[in-house]
Amino acid sequence: MAPYPAVDWAPHPIYRPVKNNYLEQAGPYPYEAEYIRMVGGTTWHWAAHCWRLVLNDMRMQSLYGVGVDWPFGYDELEPFYHESEELMGVSGLPNTGSPRNLPFPMEPVAEVWATKRIRERLAIGGYEVVGNTTARNSRGYHGRPPCCGNNSCQPICPIDAQYHGGIAVSDAEAAGVKLLANAVVYKLEHDEKGRITAALFYDQNKVSHRVTGDTFILAANAIETPKLLLLSASDNYPAR
């Protein structure tokens, strides 16, 4: 994450050269999760892999006795997978093990020579190489050019052929959304029915602000979202 330094008011997990201990490793299997806390998030520094879950992923407890089963099935999630793929511009082939009702928005990005050679050699032994599924343009898509093979998907695509959250932000602002950057939400308030009524956030000067609204969408990540919910615990909804 070095190309995107953390800021004092919104640090992200750092492990090298020195740990900043942003994440407390309290479990038996430490996991050095890395992500960026900024507008656009970790999509500024990713390889754009956009794999869907396979069917068995949603029934880990039932099938393997570990974890928990999802509270709904793959079929309910599938339309939203495709909607996300359309928004980001995902390319790939259908042989990923995840059922699809509609094809990918784009055909796969051109295969590099090394991948082609490996696939051909493994085919002799009866092995199939499954192509990657990425939010990277194989052709012009939504005003952005196709991948030109710069091999710099991380830390950033130099021509915007690869999706990043900043694209969605630009689209939202063009539609009239007001973006408040450098704002770290630290608590959610709710009414007696449990509906969220306000969000409290600190700006970069550690000044607290309160925003009210009719609808709130919580879309941080698998760590920051539950963290915020725990910080927002109340008598009616205690932390568990």
Give the residues covered by each predicted segment.
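FAD-binding core of FAD-dependent oxidoreductases
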Residues: R37-A47, F216, A220-E224
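Conserved redox-cofactor binding core of oxidoreductases
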Residues: P3-R16, N21-P28, R37, A47-H49, ...
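Short clusters of hydrophobic/aromatic residues that line enzyme substrate/ligand-binding pockets
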Residues: V39, M58, I196
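A short, glycine/Asx- and small/polar-enriched loop/turn
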Residues: H142-R144, D191-T197
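A generic secondary-structure signal for well-formed alpha-helical elements
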Residues: L53, D57, Y81-G92, G126, ...
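Glycine-rich loop(s) and the adjacent beta-strand/alpha-helix scaffold that form part
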Residues: M1, A174, A183, K187-D191, ...
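Short, solvent-exposed loop/turn segments at secondary-structure junctions
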Residues: T43, C50-R52, R136-N137, Y186, ...
